[in-house]
Each structure stands twice: as C-alpha cells, then as structure tokens.
From Swiss-Prot:
Record PANTHER family: UNCHARACTERIZED PROTEIN YQGE, UPF0301 PROTEIN YQGE
Region called Disordered, residue ranges: 93-120
Species the sequence originates in: Paracidovorax citrulli (strain AAC00-1)
One GO CC term on file: cytosol
InterPro entries in the record: AlgH-like (IPR003774)
Family that this chain belongs to: Belongs to the UPF0301 (AlgH) family.
Domain of life: Bacteria
HAMAP family, sorted: UPF0301
Gene3D superfamilies: VC0467-like (3.40.1740.10)
Protein name: UPF0301 protein Aave_0907
Length: 213
C-alpha cells in the first residue's frame, strides 16, 4: 500500500462468506462489521440463529419481555468469541451518559467511532446503528421502551491486525456496504442471498476462486 493511501475501512459493511470458507462458524455467513481499523475488525454474524429466542434470553436474565413483536425473534450466534456474552445491535438512540463497549482480542469495541449513547456500554457505528453490551438496553426493552429494531447475539467475530485483509486477499469474503433492511426486515433464511443481491450476484454464480474486496 502506498504510504499516502488511506487504510481500508469496512465499518458498516457486510462480509459475505465465499463457498471456499469452510470454517463452521462462518460458512455461508453474513457478518455486519461494527468496527474496522488498522488494529483489526469486530463484527456480528446476522444470519445464524441459535435455538434460544429473545423471550428465552430474557427469562434467563430474570426480565419480562413486553414487546410481543420481539418475543419469538431468535438470538443469533454472533461469532466464536465470548459466546456467553450478549451483544445488541440496534438503531441509534441518541446521546446520554454512555460509555464505550469493550471487546477482547483483535479489534476493540471502543475508541474511534464510540460516542455517548443512551446506554452504559455502547459503541456508535457510522450508518445509524449502535452495538450495546450492557444490560440496561434489555431492561429498556423489557418495559416496552428501548430501540424499535434490534438484533441480539451471543458472541462476536473478531480479526486481529491485518487478519481480515489477509482473508480478503485469499478470496474468503465478498464485501458490500450494509443495508439495514437485510439486518432487520429480511427473513433469516434469505439474508445471505439478499446480501449477495446487493452486489448483483446470486449464490450459483460463486466459486471458491472468485472474490471481491
């Protein structure tokens, strides 16, 4: 990379797994990148539901869930890192006395792009989203308040410095700017194909040797 070139920044983009990516955690996955910098990348898989519903999750943390529209929504497997920890991707709620959410390994969910939020531990993401790790967002949802659209995961996906760039060079992923309708309005089983459609592609067109970064 020339010295005066800006580093790649795929924050608020989708990573779409290529057929040659056989890692069980990421095969046919769509990852929403919450942060990408020279230090690494952090994202959430948005199309791999677990067997746990949001109502089941709220029961586990001793909260009721009054939002009937959310009760049967699945909790997603966001990635192989910290799989017992919850992450809530949601529409931005505006400033309050927020703090920064921290991840571990690879990119940290803190620093650049993290601003004050309505919740105690939140990362602000360009594109109108936030990612919250503190229980207060669940408490808000339990009362019928909180963000209107949410996606909840257990675990997240993380890449160390230069790791994602190497995987892109190996044609493990396609990349495209994120579309919120894929995250919040598209049935889970259609999200992979809908993300591909943003590039004008269909899954039958892909081969392990082709990629686009």
């Amino acid at each position: 990379m020339p010295a005066d070139s800006a580093p790649m920044n795929l924050t608020h983009h989708f990573l779409i797994a290529m057929p040659g990516l056989e890692d069980e955690s990421f095969a046919r996955s769509v990852v929403y990148l919450c942060e990408h910098s020279e230090r690494g990348a952090l994202g959430l898989i948005i199309n791999k539901p677990s067997d746990l519903s949001l109502k089941g999750l709220f029961d586990k943390v001793d909260l009721s869930l009054r939002r009937e529209d959310l009760s049967l929504e699945p909790v997603f497997r966001g990635g192989p890192v910290q799989t017992e920890r919850g992450f809530v991707l949601h529409e931005a709620m505006g400033p309050s006395s927020g703090k920064q959410a921290a991840g571990e390994g690879g990119a940290q969910a803190e620093g650049e792009g993290a601003e004050e939020s309505a919740y105690a531990s939140t990362m602000s993401i360009p594109g109108g989203l936030e990612m919250t790790t503190s229980k207060d967002v669940l408490e808000a949802l339990s009362t019928g308040a909180g963000p209107r659209r949410v996606l909840v995961t257990l675990g997240y996906s993380s890449w160390g410095e230069g790791q994602l760039e190497s995987e892109l060079a190996e044609n493990s992923w396609l990349t495209v700017g994120a579309d919120l309708s894929v995250i919040f309005d598209t049935p889970v089983g259609q999200r992979y194909d809908r993300a591909l459609a943003l590039l004008g592609l269909q899954s039958w067109m892909l081969s392990p040797e082709a990629g686009h970064a």
